[in-house]
Regions:
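Jelly-roll (double-stranded beta-helix
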Residues: 2-310
Length: 310
């Protein structure tokens, strides 16, 4: 065995591998003024993903499917994390901020007490647009915090390459001794973009106290020692097929159970995925559209204030 393989086996022997709890295929939907995208999770069982609420994969080569964008709309009580891989997202808000999120960039917006903004995607020279938007819930004590942005350019995102060639872009949190550029986030999340070479097996630490999920957007692989068909609940992965999937491929979301590490065995084409974890808030969720509060009364109050312009 190579030294890296021996090290991985040793680490797995002393750590607890997180089993796969659920495998989900992201589902096509439309948002904004008619943007075609895929939703990995959202508007469902929030407790499994707490403190996260929603993950959208906006990936398209047809400009007509995304150029209408996301015109002016409100948010309150959440944080939105936009990570762009191709193309650009131009944005503006009710506080007078204007800017653009280009390939490799990250924008972390804390909506807090309320903000109205717009996000308008523009493709790269080939017409391609690709990115992700993740929503993170704010704890009750910070629901009405003043809105703010953290904008990170691609060159500011730490990149780590392990001895076996595994490559990580560190969007947020601490990982492998490095610290990401986004700070002061209530859920203390770790958000990484991971690339593993073909056939390579890799173990990645995740704190036991966190909820964690992965989202595959290139290649395929087996997570957490899955040796056969995944005997876990699946959604959107071929209801008419008699044999459940044995690995996670493009546009698959993997929700993990408890443990302190995630393992992946990359397929023949390698694998690239987001790995996201955060500390659960364990608070009530009252959610309607772009506004997330703790009670129905708070939700009604938010929409009343929005209608009055206050």
């Amino acid at each position: 065995l190579f030294a890296a393989d021996c090290a991985n086996i040793y680490l797995e022997a002393i750590m607890s591998i997180r089993p796969v709890k659920k495998l989900i295929k992201s589902k096509p939907t439309m948002e904004g003024a008619g943007v075609h995208l895929r939703r990995a999770f959202g508007f469902g069982n929030t407790s499994d993903y707490d403190p996260f609420l929603l993950l959208d994969d906006f990936r398209n080569d047809v400009p007509e499917d995304y150029l209408a964008g996301f015109p002016w709309h409100p948010h309150r009580g959440i944080e939105t994390i936009t990570y762009v891989l191709a193309g650009t997202v131009e944005h503006g808000d009710s506080m007078g901020n204007r800017g653009a999120i280009a390939a490799g960039d990250v924008q972390w917006m804390t909506a807090g007490s309320g903000i109205i903004h717009q996000e308008m995607p523009k493709g790269d020279p080939t017409g391609r647009m690709h990115g992700f938007q993740l929503w993170a819930n704010l704890p009750s004590a910070l629901k009405m915090t003043p809105p703010r942005y953290q904008e990170v350019k691609s060159e500011e995102v730490p990149q780590i390459t392990d001895d076996d060639g595994t490559h990580v872009r560190l969007v947020c949190g601490s990982f492998w001794g490095k610290k990401g550029p986004v700070e002061g986030i209530a859920a203390d999340p770790v958000y990484i973009d991971v690339s593993v070479a073909p056939g390579q097996r890799k173990s990645l630490p995740v704190e036991t106290t966190r909820h964690a999920f992965a989202y595959v957007f290139a290649g395929s692989g087996k997570f957490c020692n899955a040796s056969g068909p995944l005997a876990v609940p699946t959604e959107g992965v071929g209801w008419l097929e008699t044999v459940p999937p044995s690995e996670a491929d493009n546009r698959s979301l993997i929700l993990f159970d408890s443990g302190d590490e995630v393992t992946v065995q990359a397929g023949d084409d390698g694998i690239r995925f987001l790995l996201v974890s955060g500390k659960p808030l364990q608070e009530p969720v009252a959610w309607y559209g772009p506004i997330v509060m703790n009670t129905q009364e708070q939700l009604r109050q938010a929409f009343t204030e929005l209608e009055k312009g206050t």
